[in-house]
Structure formats: structure tokens, C-alpha cells
């Protein structure tokens, strides 16, 4: 993380204030203040770990994925015969917390802060799929977009999307 001296001073002062405001974490904030004041490059990278860059296209892909799962659920619920597919197959898996953390963070922002698609936060392990899902969701989105009626899917179309 590159910072000017002024930025470092401001951040160091913020950590000092946080230590005063939150006595239970004083040691943590003192450590962070020392890192920023010292300009220790290796440890400064630590501060950067919580930040992620998510492009507008990536945000839209996450939102489109949630909307696709919404359409899958609506279509499934409207089917007269559901025997060919279990409801578990329609459950949104989330994103890998290790390899896809930025997508998982955005998902949590959308559901928790924005209050949208909250029904998808019922996924297992806090929506940590524990395996990368981004590429799978892209294929599923392509299959979904190829369907003539995105919200009135047949059983065959639902299965085709899930198997993409």
C-alpha cells in the first residue's frame, strides 16, 4: 500500500483514536499505528488485504447470478410436476471465501446492507461454496439468457441451466 506522509499521519492518528475509543482492542490499534508510522512495507500490505476492487461488470454478474437463481426458483415453484428435480439442486451455493472473496463480500453487501436477495443468504456455510463458482455461474448465465422466457422456464430448461 503506497501512502504519502500526510496520509500515513492521518491514518496513524485514526488508529490512535480507535485505540482510545475501543479499549478492548487497544493493542491491535497500537500495532497498526506503529506499522503506519514506521512505513513498514511488508506489514502495510496487511492493511490492504481487506480492500478489494470489483468492477462494474463483476458487480452486474453477481447481481445477474442472483436474479437467475430467483428466476430458477420462481419457475420451479410454478411447475406442475417437480419430481425430476429436488429443491436442494436449486439452492444457491455462494462463492469461495478463499479464491472468490471479493464476490462473496459483494454478495454479503447486497444481501445485508442493501437488503436485496436475502433469501439467498440461507445457503450453507454462510454462502462460502468452498470451491470456485464464478466460471460455473458464467456458463449458467449463458444458458439462462439463451432461454426465450427467462422467468417461465420448463423443467428441461432449468436442468440445462443447472448442468451448464
From Swiss-Prot:
InterPro entries: UPF0304_YfbU (IPR005587), YfbU_alpha-helical_sf (IPR023146), YfbU_helix-hairpin_sf (IPR023145). This is UPF0304 protein HSM_1818. Belongs to the UPF0304 family. Pfam families: YfbU.
Amino acid at each position: 500500500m503506497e501512502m504519502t506522509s500526510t496520509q500515513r499521519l492521518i491514518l496513524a492518528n485514526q488508529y490512535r483514536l480507535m485505540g482510545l475509543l475501543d479499549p478492548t482492542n487497544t493493542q491491535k490499534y497500537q500495532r497498526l499505528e506503529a506499522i503506519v508510522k514506521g512505513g513498514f512495507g511488508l506489514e502495510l500490505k496487511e492493511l490492504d488485504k481487506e480492500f478489494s476492487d470489483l468492477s462494474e461488470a463483476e458487480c452486474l454478474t453477481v447481481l445477474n447470478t442472483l436474479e437467475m437463481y430467483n428466476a430458477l426458483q420462481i419457475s420451479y415453484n410454478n411447475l406442475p410436476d417437480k419430481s425430476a428435480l429436488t429443491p436442494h439442486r436449486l439452492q444457491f451455493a455462494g462463492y469461495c471465501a478463499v479464491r472468490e472473496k471479493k464476490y462473496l463480500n459483494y454478495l454479503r453487501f447486497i444481501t445485508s446492507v442493501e437488503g436485496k436477495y436475502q433469501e439467498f443468504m440461507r445457503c450453507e456455510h454462510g454462502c462460502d461454496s468452498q470451491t470456485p463458482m464464478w466460471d460455473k455461474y458464467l456458463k449458467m448465465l449463458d444458458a439462462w439468457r439463451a432461454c426465450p422466457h427467462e422467468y417461465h422456464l420448463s423443467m428441461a430448461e432449468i436442468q440445462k441451466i443447472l448442468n451448464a
